[in-house]
Design a protein with these regions (language model features):
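Conserved tyrosine-mediated DNA breakage-rejoining catalytic core shared by Y-recombinases
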Residues: 42-68
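Hydrophobic/aromatic-rich, well-ordered segments within soluble, folded domains that form packed cores
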Residues: 30-47, 129
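Basic, Lys/Arg- and aromatic-enriched nucleic-acid-binding interface segment
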Residues: 1-37
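Conserved small/polar residues in nucleotide/adenosyl-binding loops
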Residues: 183-189
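Extended alpha-helical coiled-coil/alpha-solenoid scaffold regions
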Residues: 7, 75-80, 162, 170, ...
Length: 191
C-alpha cells in the first residue's frame, strides 16, 4: 500500500479493503442496473473519514446496505491515509479507485497465487472465520449432535455477518405459510 506508483498503490489498497472487510470486488454496471457497489466501484460519497476512523455506508449486491466502521490504527492507519489521498480532490460521485477494475484486482491476486481471484479470496476469508470458530470449541467432537449443529450454525452465521450476507425470504415462502396454516386449521375427524 506504500507503492510509489499510483496505480499499484490503488490496486493494493483495494485488495486490502477486500481483506479487511470481506467486501465484494465490485464491477462496472450498465446504466439501467441498480446502483450497487463493491470495492473497486466505491465512490467518495460511500466513505467518511474522521481522524481516527473509516466509515463505509453504501448499497452492496442485491441492494443490501453495507455499513462498517474501521478504527484507523495499526495497518489500518496506512489504509486510512491512502483513502484520504485518493478522495482528496474528488467529487462525491467519483470513484475512489479510478482506473482500477475487478480485472486489475484479480490479476494482482492471480500473480500471487495461480487462479486466485477476489471471489476465491473472499471465500477463503469466510472459511477462515468458520474454521476459527469451530477450533475455539476444542471438545466439539465429544458434544451431542445438537451442540455440534449449534456450533456449525453459529460459525456459519459469523462468516455470513462478516460477508454482509442477509437472509432473504424464500420464493416459496407464501406457499409454505399457507400449507402450515391449513395443516394447523384442519380439524380432526371423529372416528
Amino acid at each position: 500500500m506504500q507503492n510509489k506508483e499510483q496505480k499499484n498503490k490503488r490496486i493494493a489498497t483495494a485488495c486490502y479493503l477486500i481483506y479487511r472487510t470481506a467486501m465484494r470486488v465490485g464491477d462496472e454496471k450498465d446504466p439501467d442496473e441498480a446502483d450497487t457497489v463493491g470495492a473497486t466501484t466505491l465512490r467518495k460519497e460511500h466513505i467518511k473519514l474522521t481522524e481516527n476512523t473509516i466509515e463505509f455506508d453504501f448499497l452492496g449486491k442485491d441492494g443490501v446496505r453495507w455499513t462498517e466502521t474501521i478504527p484507523a490504527e495499526g495497518h489500518d492507519k496506512q489504509f486510512h491515509d491512502n483513502l484520504k489521498e485518493f478522495i482528496s480532490n474528488k467529487k462525491e460521485n467519483e470513484e475512489i479507485f479510478d482506473g482500477i477494475t475487478s480485472r486489475h484486482v484479480n490479476a494482482y491476486y492471480s500473480s500471487i497465487v495461480k487462479d486466485l481471484s477476489a471471489k476465491v479470496f473472499r471465500t477463503y476469508l469466510a472459511s477462515s472465520v468458520v474454521s476459527k470458530n469451530l477450533r475455539d470449541h476444542d471438545n466439539i467432537k465429544s458434544e451431542s449432535d445438537m451442540k455440534k449443529l449449534f456450533h456449525a450454525k453459529s460459525a456459519n452465521l459469523d462468516a455470513a455477518i462478516m460477508c454482509n450476507h442477509k437472509r432473504t425470504i424464500p420464493k416459496n415462502f407464501e406457499a409454505s405459510l399457507q400449507t402450515v396454516s391449513y395443516t394447523h386449521l384442519t380439524l380432526p375427524t371423529k372416528a
